């Protein structure tokens, strides 16, 4: 399941200046991820990754944080993490309307396909 988007700000100074940090703040949903880019992320990154894991008999259940750079409407993979990103989770979770414990339970029990994940129509 696609679990929402966020965009963080890495630079220490305003206007994207200064050295990189672990994240100076974030907002969600990420404006840059439109329907076309989301489709590209899923088809070019998510599906091939999950297919490769399954092919190696190593199916994955849990968060797969995908750190991206988007340039000219194309997503480029920077990193994977098997946890939510910080500060991204701080702006994604307040938007979650569904019960997160139920989502985790269904993920552990390989039942996410039937799990409906609903979002509040807010920006954080």
Regions flagged by a language model, labelled:
Residues 1-87:
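Internal nucleotide-binding/catalytic subdomain
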Residues 8, 91, 99-103, 118:
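Poly-acidic low-complexity segments
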Residues 104-124:
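A glycine-rich beta-turn/hairpin centered on an aromatic-Pro dipeptide
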Residues 43, 96-108:
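Short, conserved active-site entrance elements at the starts or edges of catalytic domains
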Residues 38, 49, 95, 107, ...:
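Functionally constrained cores in energy, signaling, and assembly domains
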Residues 83-99:
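ATP-dependent carboxylate-activation loops
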């Amino acid at each position: 399941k696609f679990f929402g988007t966020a965009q963080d700000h890495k630079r220490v100074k305003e206007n994207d200046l200064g050295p990189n940090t672990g994240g100076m703040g974030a907002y969600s949903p990420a404006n840059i991820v439109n329907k076309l880019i989301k489709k590209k992320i899923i088809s070019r990154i998510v599906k091939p990754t999950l297919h490769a894991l399954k092919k190696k008999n190593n199916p994955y259940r849990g968060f797969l944080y995908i750190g991206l750079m988007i340039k000219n409407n194309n997503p480029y993979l920077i990193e994977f993490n098997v946890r939510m990103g910080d500060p991204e989770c701080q702006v994604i979770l307040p938007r979650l309307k569904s019960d997160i414990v139920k989502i985790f339970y269904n993920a552990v029990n390989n039942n996410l396909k039937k799990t409906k994940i609903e979002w509040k129509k807010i920006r954080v």
